């Protein structure tokens, strides 16, 4: 089913060449389908690459998806033009009164910094708190998963002796959870990071349910509040990790 974006979003041409059905707002108005509204907080420096990766993944759903991109206001982007951000991105101020069916918060290349030293940390924590009343289900990817573990549950990340990088074998722990429906019992997924929250700390948190993990790489997927919060620790959505 189609992805709805602004008509002249640059990555639209690439998606169409890949036979992904993308439509603009004008055409969407004539579709007698209630779309699901997804907000994407894009924290990655190369925003257009991340847009493409996430829209490819969202195109696999049978539902019509209405995507809104958001960027933080408290950080000056150096790798994406201001004109692109002004044209295709909303800010928290713009959307804070809205509600969304789902939200994706991407990773960011700041994992070796203390959370409080990230220049947009205060804004991000406000956004994370806002999701609890304005978003039905949120998925936190990579560094954002670490940020959510720290902010909501007080779990600290720890530096690794050497960078974790590569494909690792994982196993599904609870097949009854819809989020892992369609997963193989054992599957490969990539990780690329310098820090981790120990898997034992996550298992020990009564508010979290681990859905998939690796003996070598630790957490891959966890959830809280019956799926209102979902944490994906690998880099399976990225082609440029």
Stretches found by the model and what they are:
Residues 68-70, 78-83:
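Active-site donor-binding segments of glycosyltransferases and PAPS-dependent sulfotransferases
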Residues 105-174:
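Cysteine-nucleophile active-site neighborhood
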Residues 102:
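Short, Asp-centered acidic motifs that coordinate Mg2+ and/or phosphate
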Residues 80-99:
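Glycine-rich, highly charged phosphate/nucleotide-binding loops
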Residues 83-86, 118-122, 191:
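Conserved phosphate-coordination/catalytic loops
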Residues 1-74, 95, 99, 126, ...:
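Amide-donor transfer/coupling interface in amidating biosynthetic enzymes
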Residues 49, 76-79, 111-114:
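Short active-site-adjacent helix-start/loop capping segments
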């Amino acid at each position: 089913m189609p992805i709805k974006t602004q008509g002249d979003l640059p990555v639209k041409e690439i998606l169409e060449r890949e036979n992904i059905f993308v439509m603009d707002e004008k055409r969407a108005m004539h579709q007698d389908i209630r779309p699901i509204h997804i907000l994407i907080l894009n924290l990655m420096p190369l925003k257009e690459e991340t847009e493409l990766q996430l829209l490819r993944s969202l195109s696999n759903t049978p539902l019509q998806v209405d995507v809104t991109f958001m960027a933080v206001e408290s950080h000056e982007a150096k790798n994406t033009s201001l004109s692109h951000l002004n044209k295709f991105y909303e800010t928290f101020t713009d959307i804070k009164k809205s509600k969304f069916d789902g939200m994706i918060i991407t990773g960011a290349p700041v994992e070796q910094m203390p959370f409080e030293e990230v220049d947009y940390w205060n804004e991000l924590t406000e956004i994370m708190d806002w999701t609890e009343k304005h978003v039905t289900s949120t998925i936190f990817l990579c560094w954002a998963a670490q940020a959510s573990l720290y902010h909501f549950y007080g779990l600290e990340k720890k530096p690794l002796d050497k960078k974790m990088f590569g494909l690792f074998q994982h196993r599904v722990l609870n097949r009854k959870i819809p989020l892992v429906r369609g997963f193989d019992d054992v599957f490969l997924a990539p990780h690329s990071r310098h820090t981790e929250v120990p898997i034992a700390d996550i298992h020990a948190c009564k508010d979290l349910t681990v859905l998939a993990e690796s003996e070598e790489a630790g957490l891959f997927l966890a959830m809280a509040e019956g799926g209102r919060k979902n944490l994906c620790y690998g880099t399976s959505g990225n082609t440029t990790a």
